[in-house]
Amino acid sequence: MGEEVQIGATAVGIKAKDGVVLAAEKRVSYGFYTLSSAGKKVFIINDKLAIASAGIIADMQTLARILKLNVMSYELEVRKKPTVRAMAKLLSIIMFSRRLLPFYAEVLVGGVDEEGPHLIVMDPLGSLIEDNYAALGTGAKLAVSLLDATYRPDISLQEAKKLAVQAIKAAIERDPVSGGGIDLAVVDNNGAREEEVKIQMVI
């Protein structure tokens, strides 16, 4: 039997009263070897939808590209933006269709539509769970303990951003295969935007 190798990543999603925040650390690792500290695990799909992921970078990028193309196609055909649940369901079908050789990625889908903000959690086979907050990846247990203690249903978008950064930092401090800086995707009625938080590690 070979030695188990972990693909490190930590991603967090928080639904606020006025939007959604997705966050992920930037380290790309193979086991305890760091390949890069500039990995992208947060992706803007359109101005109302974003995803964050934990797993293999290539699979994350492929899923983001597939979803972006399908959103563009829908908007051209129907002349309106798809709902968050509809795009999550589409991604679920795509992931389940690969169940014999699945994408090695857990996904957070976050966005805003006519019904308000949504956060949907997906496993590698495409199971869907809508929730108020979630954490994925090797640092998930560390991050979600902070979310459990701090989250409120009436949390504002600015408070959610701060909490997401704190949760990722908590994972980075203890999880040896998470690290680098933090990428954020913030989605509200004004659109979707990316932000970066640099972290200085003290050794």
UniProtKB/Swiss-Prot annotation:
Q: Which PROSITE patterns match?
A: PROTEASOME_BETA_1, PROTEASOME_BETA_2
Query: Quick check: keyword rRNA-binding in the entry?
Result: no
Which keywords does this chain's UniProt record carry? Autocatalytic cleavage, Cytoplasm, Hydrolase, Protease, Proteasome, Threonine protease, Zymogen
| A Pfam match | Proteasome
- Spell out the activity regulation: The formation of the proteasomal ATPase PAN-20S proteasome complex, via the docking of the C-termini of PAN into the intersubunit pockets in the alpha-rings, triggers opening of the gate for substrate entry. Interconversion between the open-gate and close-gate conformations leads to a dynamic regulation of the 20S proteasome proteolysis activity.
Query: Which GO BP terms sit in this record?
Result: proteasomal protein catabolic process
**E.C. number:** 3.4.25.1
HAMAP family, alphabetically?
Answer: Proteasome_B_A (MF_02113_A)
What this chain does, per the record?
Component of the proteasome core, a large protease complex with broad specificity involved in protein degradation.
Write down what this protein is called.
Proteasome subunit beta 1
Q: Which gene encodes it?
A: psmB1
